[in-house]
């Protein structure tokens, strides 16, 4: 009887110990589940942060590409404007050369006209002298008439030359007028081009400032990219660590659940043994 009681007490003690171990396993399993849920939540948070960082990185790279494209367009526009200015300067130089040649032709025609006018004046003076002078003899008169005819012929030739010179002078004046018009147009175009060049210069300064700002922004973007890349690597490392922690915790939970099942099985067996012992005790009494 004492042996049975001792056995029952031992079984009861073992049962209590099994209950304590079962409760301990349940608490450990609960804590492990909480740690696993917390680790999964941290992993999801890290994944969201990684996605946000990747989106920021894509947006930064897109802005950098847009700024570079605008800068290339401004540089092409500046090159085109410089080419137009060079072509117009060449045209202005050619117009100036045409004007110089026209002025030379005008000066030559004016000199020839002066010579013809002087010859005509001299012939007229000679004719008047011959008319006023008393002619002594017929031979002298014939000679004077011949001289007069020659002088008239020279005067007619001078008139013809004068007309030709006047015609050429009119042509030269017309050419000069057209050249002056072209020169005025060229000067107006020069003023316009100078204004455009000033605007282009201002735009170039703005572009230089924009380029400097773009370089600063590019450097900032590069620093941001480096920072984001570092943060991304750190987040990935933390995510991998969290994933490994979750896996480790999951294994611990599985182990504790297995122990809990084993302890429950032992508890059931002890309960069965106690029931059997009580039955045997009752039967013996």
Swiss-Prot record:
GO molecular function: protein homodimerization activity
InterPro entries (alphabetical): Tropomyosin (IPR000533)
UniProt KW keywords: Allergen, Coiled coil, Muscle protein, Repeat
Residue stretches in coiled coil: 1-273
Biological-process GO terms, alphabetical: regulation of muscle contraction
Keyword Thylakoid annotated: no
Any matching Pfam family: Tropomyosin
Subunit and partners: Homodimer.
Biological function: Tropomyosin, in association with the troponin complex, plays a central role in the calcium dependent regulation of muscle contraction.
Domain comment as written in the entry: The molecule is in a coiled coil structure that is formed by 2 polypeptide chains. The sequence exhibits a prominent seven-residues periodicity.
Family statement: Belongs to the tropomyosin family.
Annotated protein name in UniProt: Tropomyosin
Taxon lineage: Eukaryota, Metazoa, Ecdysozoa, Arthropoda, Hexapoda
């Amino acid at each position: 009887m004492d042996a049975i009681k001792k056995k029952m007490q031992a079984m009861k003690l073992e049962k209590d110990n099994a209950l304590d171990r079962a409760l301990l396993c349940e608490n450990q399993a609960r804590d492990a589940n909480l740690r696993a849920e917390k680790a999964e939540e941290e992993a999801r948070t890290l994944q969201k942060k990684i996605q946000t960082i990747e989106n920021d990185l894509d947006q930064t790279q897109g802005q950098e590409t847009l700024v570079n494209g605008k800068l290339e367009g401004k540089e092409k526009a500046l090159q085109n404007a410089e080419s137009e200015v060079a072509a117009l300067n060449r045209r202005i130089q050619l117009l100036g050369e045409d004007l110089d040649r026209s002025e030379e032709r005008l000066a030559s025609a004016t000199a020839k006209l002066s010579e013809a006018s002087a010859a005509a004046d001299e012939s007229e003076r000679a004719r008047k002298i011959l008319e006023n002078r008393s002619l002594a003899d017929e031979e002298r008169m014939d000679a004077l008439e011949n001289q007069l005819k020659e002088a008239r012929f020279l005067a007619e030739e001078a008139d013809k030359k004068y007309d030709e010179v006047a015609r050429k002078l009119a042509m030269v004046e017309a050419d000069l007028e057209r050249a002056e018009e072209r020169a005025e147009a060229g000067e107006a175009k020069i003023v316009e081009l100078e204004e455009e060049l000033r605007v282009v210069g201002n735009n170039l300064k703005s572009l230089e400032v924009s380029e400097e700002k773009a370089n600063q922004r590019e450097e900032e973007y590069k620093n941001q990219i480096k920072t984001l890349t570092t943060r991304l690597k750190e987040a990935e490392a933390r995510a991998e660590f969290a994933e490994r922690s979750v896996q480790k915790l999951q294994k611990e939970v599985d182990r504790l659940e297995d122990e809990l099942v084993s302890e429950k099985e032992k508890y059931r067996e002890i309960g069965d043994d106690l029931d059997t012992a009580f039955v045997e005790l009752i039967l013996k009494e």
